[in-house]
A protein has these predicted regions:
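Conserved PDZ fold ligand-binding element
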Residues: 197-200, 205-231
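Internal alpha-helical transmembrane segments
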Residues: 67-68, 79, 112-190, 417-421
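Long, highly hydrophobic alpha-helical transmembrane signal-anchor segments
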Residues: 33-81, 333-365, 437, 446
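Functional transmembrane alpha-helices
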Residues: 12-19, 134-135, 139-141, 182-189, ...
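Topogenic membrane-insertion module of multi-pass membrane proteins
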Residues: 2-48, 52
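Terminal peptide-recognition signature
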Residues: 69, 107, 208, 216-219, ...
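Small-residue-rich helix-interface/hinge motifs
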Residues: 2-7, 12-14, 50-130, 370-400
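PDZ-domain C-terminal substructure recognizer with occasional recognition of PDZ-binding tails
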Residues: 214, 220-222, 234-277
């Protein structure tokens, strides 16, 4: 590093040793900007700029979530005197970095996450003898456990705060209704037109409009089968074969009417299309009620996520089925699918409350899901390291009972095959979900 005054002056004047890295970094930044611009142009041309904005907001939200996750590890490690040498956002080539104290902070080229480097996090890490007393592996088990849990805690805390913001600032959406809030004037001619709500070059009047369905109507049955909420209604519509008339029983001004609609299809979209939107009423909560709502909603999302993941193996064939939306477990999405839904939410014409509510709910669900999955006792996730810590303590306790010395830390070298297997399984599942989200996406509206 220290190459003398002469070299320092030459490099300061733009010598080859300095110019080459700068040129490479400028090239990397330029390529990233060009790539991002091309992706935005392609998405904008196909789905509209509102859709692109939704994806951008989603990516920003996820990036903030991941940064907070790593900040949880970083702050708890520092509070216990552990040495943290790096805190970076992104992966790949470094775009910018600065050193503050003993830690290097920076941004890398690929914004797909973040990482913290804590000295001696595992027995596999090489540590300078001078830093060994401050290494994570030399700290008490309870401190190491707190550091490992801190990442998921940040996900849960962020989700809870977003739920409070949703309840107090936006309001709770009462979508447990079948009342019509809007009727589309047309059948969109393409998936792009569908996402934008555009009627340019349409395929004619929407089935709901042609049948005489009006905003304010409450749909109570489809083909004589009662529907009690919007989910049931959407499932019934999507299951109806396009072109086949169906009886829609509505309640209007206290009277029941039976109207007949012929569902249509939108090119590139799965399921039949009726052209209706629900009437959602948003009710704001006071702070006390908001806390109760946040706790209840948190538990519901956590339980729902666990059930969906448990049922996912059996639902894998339904990922590519035409009626994917009918199987809740098959609605589990990759980040690609979640970004697509965020884009749809912003591109929809349901109003700003609906848009913000949908975006917040997406981020809330993902943070709760990530926080829970990350605590599963499987390496290389945080829960796997936590399980190893518990195993070490149980093993040490049993050794004391037998009058033997503490066996010490677990040799993680022996667990590498397990980590590789779990990692490969997660990658495979992620690729499968991503393929389903690309070729058989989930849509928000009916």
């Amino acid at each position: 590093m220290n190459q003398g005054q002469g070299d320092g002056q030459a490099q300061g004047q733009g010598g080859p040793a300095t110019v080459a890295p700068r040129v490479r970094m400028i090239t990397v930044r330029a390529l990233l900007v060009i790539a991002a611009a091309l992706v935005a142009l392609l998405l904008g041309a196909r789905h509209g700029w509102a859709f692109v904005l939704g994806i951008a907001l989603f990516v920003l939200g996820i990036l903030i979530s991941v940064i907070l996750h790593e900040a949880g590890h970083f702050l708890t490690a520092k509070s216990f005197g552990m040495k943290a040498t790096q805190f970076f956002v992104g992966f790949g080539p470094t775009l910018w970095s600065t050193v503050r104290g003993e830690t290097e902070y920076g941004v890398k080229a690929l914004p797909f996450g973040a990482f913290v480097r804590i000295t001696g996090m595992t027995t596999l890490d090489e540590v300078d003898p001078a830093d060994e007393p401050r290494s994570m592996r030399n700290k008490p088990a309870w401190q190491r456990a707190i550091v490992m849990v801190a990442g998921s805690f940040m996900h849960f805390a962020l989700a809870f705060v977003l739920l409070l913001i949703l309840a107090i600032g936006i309001g709770q959406a009462n979508d447990n209704t079948t009342t019509i809030g809007s009727v589309s004037p047309c059948v969109p001619a393409s998936l792009k037109a569908f996402d934008q709500g555009s009627c340019t070059h349409s395929q004619g009047a929407a089935p709901a409009k042609a049948a005489g369905i009006k905003p304010g109507d409450k749909i109570i049955a489809i083909d004589g089968k009662p529907v009690h909420n919007w989910v049931q209604l959407g499932t019934a519509i999507r299951a109806q074969p396009a072109g086949q008339p169906m009886a829609v029983t509505v309640e209007r001004d206290g009277q029941e009417l039976t109207l007949h609609a012929v569902p249509a299809t939108v090119p590139g979209r799965n399921g039949s299309y009726l052209g209706i939107g629900d009437a959602v009423i948003f009710t704001r909560s006071n702070p006390i009620a908001a806390v109760a709502f946040a706790g209840s909603a948190f538990g519901q999302v956590l339980t729902g996520s666990a059930e969906a993941v448990a049922k996912l193996p059996a639902a894998l064939p339904d990922l590519f089925a035409r009626d994917r939306a009918k199987t809740p477990a098959a609605n589990v999405s990759s980040m690609v699918g979640a970004a697509d839904i965020a884009g749809q939410a912003v591109a929809s014409s349901g109003g700003w409350r609906y848009t913000v509510s949908d975006l917040l709910l997406i981020l809330i669900s993902i943070n709760i899901f990530l926080g829970a999955v990350n605590l599963l006792p499987l390496l290389p996730m945080d829960g796997g390291h936590l399980a190893v810590i518990f195993y070490e303590r149980i093993r040490a306790w049993l050794a004391r009972l037998r009058g033997k010395p503490d066996p010490g830390l677990v040799d993680l070298q022996k667990l590498i095959p397990v980590s590789v297997g779990v990692f490969a399984l997660l990658i495979g599942l992620g690729v499968l979900l991503m393929a389903a989200d690309i070729f058989n996406p989930v849509h928000l509206v009916q």
